[in-house]
Amino acid sequence: MTEPLIRVRGVSRAFPAGDEMVRVLKDVDLDIEAGEMMAIIGASGSGKSTLMNILGCLDRPTTGSYWIEGRETSKMAVDELAALRRERFGFIFQRYHLLGDLSAASNVEVPAIYAGRSRSDRHKRAISLLTRLGLAERTGNIPSKLSGGQQQRVSIARALMNGGEIILADEPTGALDTHSGAEVMKILRELHAEGHTIILVTHDKKIAEHADRVVEISDGVIISDERNVSRSTTARPIREHGPSAGWRGAIDRMTEALRMAGAAIWAHKMRSLLTMLGIIIGIASVAAISALGAGSQQQILSSISSLGTNTIEVRAGKGFGDLEAGKIRTLVPADAEALVNQPYVDSVTPTVTTSVTVKRAAVAVNASVTGVGADFFRVRGLELAHGQLFDAQDVIAYSQNVVIDASAARDLFPDRVNPVGQVILLGTMPARVVGVTKRENSFGPAVDTLTVYAPYTTVMGRMLGRPNVDGITVRIRDDVDPGNVEAAVTRLIERRHGAKDFFLTNSATIRETIETTTQTLTLLISSVAVISLIVGGIGVMNIMLVSVTERTKEIGVRVAVGARRSDILSQFLIEAVMVCLVGGLMGIMLALGISALFNLLSPDFKMIFSPGSIIVAFACSTLIGIVFGFLPARNAAKLDPIEALARD
C-alpha cells in the first residue's frame, strides 16, 4: 500500500481560554492522496480552519502527528516548515491577502523570492500565470485597481508560483459574486485535472459538491467522509520550485529586501523623514563638533608655532606664578651665549619685556617692548612683511633700530604711511622702525597685543637698567629629541647658577597637552551630541514597532508563502538601517553646509572635516539602525502567522 501524500493521526488542537484549555480539534484522523480534490465542510467554529492551518504548516497540533510524504512535521524546525510551505503548498484566501503596494505581477512573484529564483525567471513565470488566468492586461495593476474576482485570480497565480503541488483554498468564493465564484471554481477544477491536490475549506455545500471527496467536521470531530465520485487518477504536477540557488539566492533575497525596504520608506515619506530627523540632527551635531574640534586644534597648534618651532623656554623662578621670580637676577645673556655652542641647539635668543606708551605724531598706544637677540626671528619663525631685521651688530651697539608687528603698524600708522624709516617714541626713547613682521596667529589671551621688538641690550641698558633677562628661548635642531635636550639644558644652566632657580617649558610638551585637551573636549561635547543620536534611535525603534503593527497582515502573508524568520528579520532590520543611513547622509550634508557657511563667515577659523569622521558617522548610523531596529525586526519575525493573517 502506497504512503498517502498527507496523513493525520490523532491530531488535537487546544487553545487557552482563561484558566482552561479549549479543544478545537479532537483526535482527528485523515488521509489525503496526491491528486485528490477534497472539501472540508463545517459550520463556523467547527474547527475546519484550524485543521487547514495545521495541514498548511501554519500551526502545529497540540497532540497527535501530521505526516507529509512520510515526513513527521512535528519534529521540523520553523524554517523547515517554511520550506514546506514554500515548495509544496499554495494558499488561496477568502480575503485574497494581496500586498496593497505591489502590482499583480509583483504579488505573484513573492513566493519565488523566498525560493531563490532569479528576478527575470520569476517575472516571466508571473506574467505567464496571470496571462493564463485572463489577467494579461492587469499585470501592472495594484490590488485596489482590480475587482474581487481578479484579485482572487492573482491569489491563485501566487499559489501556483512555486508549483502549488497542494493548494489550500479557504472559502475561495466567500467574498465573490456568483459569476466570479463560478470562474474560480472552474480554475480549481482545471488545476485538479492537471494533478494538483486541492483542499477546499468551506461552509457552503454547493461549493463542496465540486470536490470528489467531502469531509464534514463538527465540534472538532470528523463526522463524515464521503466521495461524490470515484477519484480519477491524475498525473502529479511538475514542481516549479527548486532549492535556493545558494549564495546567489541569498544575494537575490537580500536585494529584494533592500528594494522592499526602500518601497516601504517611500510609501510613508513624511513619517520616514520625521523618523530620520533625530538621526539627522545627531549625526550633523557629532560631525560638526568633530570638525570644529579639528579646526580648533589646528588653530591652536598653529598659534603654538608662534612660540618657535621645537623650542625650549628658560625662565627664572620655580614656575609660572612664582612671586619670588622677580627677585631672581641670575638669568643673564651669558647663559644664552653658553647655549649657542651646544650641539643640539639651532639658535638662541634672550628675551626681556616691558610695557611702555609708544607714540608717533599724535598717536599714542600702550605696547609691549620685547628685547631680543638677532636670532629671535629665526627662533620664533617670524617673517617680515616690510623692511629688514636688526642684526648682531645692532645688539652689540645698543642700537635703537626696532621691528614692529602688524598690529602696532596698524595702530601707530592709521594713515597707512609706510612705517619703515619712521621714528617712534618708546616712552622717552626715540627709535627708528626698520621692519614690520607679518601677522601671526598669537597663542594665549594677548591675541591683539601691540609689540615692538628691539635689541635686548637696548631694552636692558637704555630702558630698564638691569643686567638680567626674563627668559631665554632655545630652538632645537630638528634631528634631536626635545626630551633629551630639556635635561641637557637643565644641567647646563644649573651648573652655571649653582642652583635650580629656573624652570623650562617645552613647546613640544605644550603641543601634546593642547592636542590631548582639545581631543578630550571634542569627545566630551560629542558625547552630549550622541544623546541626540540615541533619542533618534529610540524614535526609529518606535516607528518600526508601529510599522510592524501596521504590516502584521503583510508579515502573515509572507510567512504563509514560505518566508523564513530570517527573511522577515532581515527585511525589517534593513528598513531600519536604511532609515538611519539616509538620515546619516542627510546629517553629514547638513554638517557640510554648516561648515561651508561657518568658514565663509569666519575666514580665520576653519571647520575641518576628515574622511575618518565621515566614516565614523556612517558607522554610527548603521549601528543605530541595527541596535534600535533589531527589537521590532525580531518581533516581526516571531509573529504567529495565524494571528497575523486574522488581523484586519
Swiss-Prot record:
GO-annotated biological processes: response to antibiotic
EC annotation?
Answer: 7.6.2.-
Q: Where are the transmembrane segments?
A: 273-293, 528-548, 572-592, 613-633
The record's keywords, sorted A to Z, are: Antibiotic resistance, ATP-binding, Cell inner membrane, Cell membrane, Membrane, Nucleotide-binding, Plasmid, Translocase, Transmembrane, Transmembrane helix, Transport
Q: Which residues form the signal peptide?
A: none
Record carries keyword Membrane = yes
Summary of the function given for this chain in its UniProt record: Non-canonical ABC transporter that contains transmembrane domains (TMD), which form a pore in the inner membrane, and an ATP-binding domain (NBD), which is responsible for energy generation. Confers resistance against macrolides.
Name of this chain's protein: Macrolide export ATP-binding/permease protein MacB
**Organism from which the protein derives:** Agrobacterium fabrum (strain C58 / ATCC 33970) (Agrobacterium tumefaciens (strain C58))
